[in-house]
Regions:
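N-terminal hydrophobic or amphipathic helices/low-complexity stretches enriched
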Residues: 1-41, 47-60, 71-75, 136-137, ...
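A non-catalytic alpha/beta surface segment that caps or lines the substrate-entry region
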Residues: 34-137, 159-206
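Generic structural signal for residues in well-ordered beta-strands
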Residues: 60-62, 266, 341-343
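Histidine-centered divalent metal-coordination motifs
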Residues: 151
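Extracytoplasmic/secreted proteins, especially bacterial periplasmic and envelope-associated proteins
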Residues: 20-23, 27, 44, 48, ...
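Proline/glycine-enriched tight loop/beta-turn segments at coil->beta junctions
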Residues: 138-145
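Zn-dependent metallopeptidase/amidohydrolase metal-coordination segment
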Residues: 26, 342-354
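Acidic/histidine-rich catalytic neighborhood of metal-dependent amide-processing enzymes
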Residues: 102-133, 141, 154-159, 189-321, ...
Length: 354
């Protein structure tokens, strides 16, 4: 049965939930502001959300974990420094050292950004963050579980997104990556032709050394990619996700709904912007629990306009495939609400769903 068929004054109650979401977003933005991963501000927002969830659920717990919040975006600075040095050293005749630095930059980028590994974490200061876990028990024993998720922290400002939106962001990153590939090819050619530690006297590869200098401004620009002193309010990314998960619990409670054998959870993760650290901590701690009981995870992130709303069937820059059964379930839910939600891929970055 659809909720619209079984709940009296359905539209009014949905509107009430929408108003609740807007009120909660405004409250956190005004009273807390930006919420750096693992910061007191992140915890303050979570404490408020936990207090709200206690009204609608049977239990609310905090699960703490350690993280290194600046490690995730630290790869950008490392790549910039390594590539500036690589280009200079190549032109001075130290192609082997240049190659090593290029590979260091490439490995940091792949491990941290494409694979979201905790690769650079030991080199950065440690903090403590937490996940908020609210549970609404079913009627009868737990045979199934559905988790609604949003992340509580907000990101450091990305300067080029602020200045030119997604197009400038992609251009800045793409130009730097092209430069890295060009330098890598030149370094391999130098080693293959016996110029590992000697400069080219002339010819094509000598000219390519000068061509690489064109990318120096690009590498300098990515050093300023992240505004480390400015944490954005994160009303869209991702208070919208948090309050959607909270609104599910409120709606169920307000209407006296308990599913038979299906437990409902709201998991409000910390430190997503630091490389999905909260989601990773939850998945690690609850791994066996999720395998023993059929579990569905629905991650809400940046719920804005209907025109931009989608079901993301691929994540982590397209490298992770989300379960198509859950995607189809969300597709059906959208149809019940009169929305034809397309399947899309997270083309740059990732979400807790990954």
């Amino acid at each position: 049965m659809k909720a619209s068929e079984g709940i009296q004054n359905y539209k009014a109650k949905v509107k009430e939930c929408v108003n609740y979401c807007v009120k909660e977003i405004k409250y956190v933005c005004k009273e807390v502001g930006g919420r750096e991963s693992g910061s007191p501000a992140e915890r303050k927002a979570q404490e408020h959300m936990a207090d709200e969830l206690r009204k609608y659920t049977d239990s609310v717990e905090f699960e703490e974990f350690d993280l290194h919040p600046k490690a995730f975006m630290g790869w950008v600075i490392i790549v910039g420094i390594c590539m500036i040095a690589s280009v200079i050293l190549y032109n001075l005749g130290f192609a082997l050292v240049s190659l090593i630095l290029t590979l260091v930059g490439a490995v940091c980028m792949i491990a941290e950004f494409l694979m979201y590994k905790e690769f650079l974490d030991p080199f950065f200061p440690k903090r403590t963050s937490a996940n908020v876990i609210a549970i609404r028990k079913p009627e009868g024993e737990v045979k199934r579980r559905i988790i609604f998720n949003g992340h509580c922290d907000s990101a450091y400002e990305w300067r080029y997104t602020y200045l030119g939106g997604g197009h400038l962001l992609v251009a800045v990153i793409a130009i730097a990556i092209v430069g890295l590939v060009v330098t890598l090819v030149c370094e391999i050619a130098a080693l293959a032709t016996g110029h590992a530690m000697t400069a080219f006297d002339g010819g094509f590869w000598k000219i390519m050394g000068y061509v690489q200098l064109i990318w120096i401004p690009s590498y300098i620009s990515i050093l300023f990619f992240t505004h480390w002193k400015l944490v954005v309010p994160g009303a869209n990314d991702n208070l919208t996700g948090c309050v959607n998960a909270m609104a599910v619990m409120k709606y169920l409670s307000d209407n006296g709904i308990r599913f038979e054998n299906t437990e409902v959870r709201a998991v409000l993760t910390g430190s997503e912007e630091a490389g999905l650290r909260g989601a990773k901590a939850y998945a690690k701690k609850h791994h066996d629990e999720c395998l023993e009981t059929e579990t569905i995870f629905i991650g809400y992130d940046t719920m804005r306009d209907y025109d931009d709303m989608a079901i993301y069937s691929r994540d982590m820059t397209g490298t992770v495939k989300n379960d198509i059964r859950v995607c189809n379930l969300m597709k059906k839910a959208g149809e019940h609400a009169g929305l034809d939600l397309p399947f899309k891929s997270v083309f740059f970055g990732s979400s807790d769903a990954a």
